[in-house]
Amino acid sequence: YNSDITRTYALSKLDSEVEKLWHAEKQAQQAAFDRAAIGTSCEDVDKAARDVLISHGLGPDYDLPGLPHRTGHGIGLDIHEGPYLVKGDKTPLAAGMCFSNEPMICSYGEFGVRLEDHIYMTAEGAAWFTEPAHSVDDPFGVTV
């Protein structure tokens, strides 16, 4: 089985606007997780993430700066497989499904922010395979 994770983090002090966008990305990822429930459509999970980004003045839809692609994809035998957490995918979430949860923010030529983790569906709802980023300067929660 295949998977991957992505972390955007800073080695030094960030511009305050970029740091705000990092937090918007984290909120969008959490919104997608919170919306993932048995029977919810894949596109509704995508919409939850996009709604957060819209509330931060990004997008809408696939407009930039904002989220230019899907919120997530199935994971398993292939690193990217269906179903997809994207507008138009009406597949209902079911126990046993596994997904990436990776909304990202892009402003071409300027910056990008992505936090990618994996979730799986249980009979009770979504659960994390990977632990979401802790902070912009300590992505794995291991400050030394």
Language-model features: locations:
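Active-site neighborhoods and metal-handling regions in enzymes and metal-associated proteins
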Residues: Y1-V144
